[in-house]
Amino acid sequence: NLAVIDFIDPDQFVEDMRSPDNKYMPVDRYSGSVIVRPDLLEEKGLPIPQSYDDLLADEYRGLIEMPDPTQSSTGYLFLKSLANAWGEEEALAYFDKLDENILQYTGGGSAPVKDAVAGECAIALSLTFKAVDLINEGADLDILFFKEGAPYTPAGLSIIAGHETRQPVIDVVTYFYSDVIDDYLSTYLPEKVKVDQ
């Protein structure tokens, strides 16, 4: 069983991340996004894609990498996100078509964006936080969010019932939800978790 966390203000978080019973406090959203190397696309005289449908164009054949949805939770997030937006049948048909343009499928969610930085692909369906990390290190990348939204999975913090009044537990949780989470979110995660983020 989980304890109610009554010493952290849940109103600091955006509504869709709040737990109705305050037994869960959000930490972040691990999201995926379409990440491009604008310089590589420009070299090839290609526009930056503006939609998932754009990725099906012949001109992007062999320029796209994504995590394998059967091996990577990030790849599965992309599949599930489009299944939620369009319905399962349409999403599966889309990925069958997209397969013709895929250079390679990777086993992990950050590999496509790392390959984009290395110049191995121009378009990566990959982890947003890794792209932000690489941009912070100087990589020339653009992060795109299409109208269907970004695939994501939330992460959070809970306390096991019976431990919520222990001072070390309170201290750790209070510390985490001080400036630590604000610094973490502003440095690595553009997805909104907190109201004032």
Model-predicted segments: where are they?
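Periplasmic-binding protein-like
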Residues: 62-70, 94-99, 105-106, 137-161, 175-196
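An extracytoplasmic/periplasmic, membrane-proximal ligand-sensing/linker region
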Residues: 88-90, 194-197
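Extracytoplasmic ligand-binding site segments that recognize negatively charged/polar headgroups
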Residues: 1-117
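Ligand-binding "clamshell"
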Residues: 1-3, 18-22, 133-145
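A ligand-binding cleft/hinge motif common to bilobed small-molecule-binding domains
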Residues: 117, 122-140
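Non-transmembrane alpha-helical segments in soluble domains
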Residues: 53-56, 83, 95, 113, ...
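A bilobed periplasmic-binding-protein/Venus flytrap-type ligand-binding module shared by bacterial periplasmic
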Residues: 35-40, 153-168, 184-187
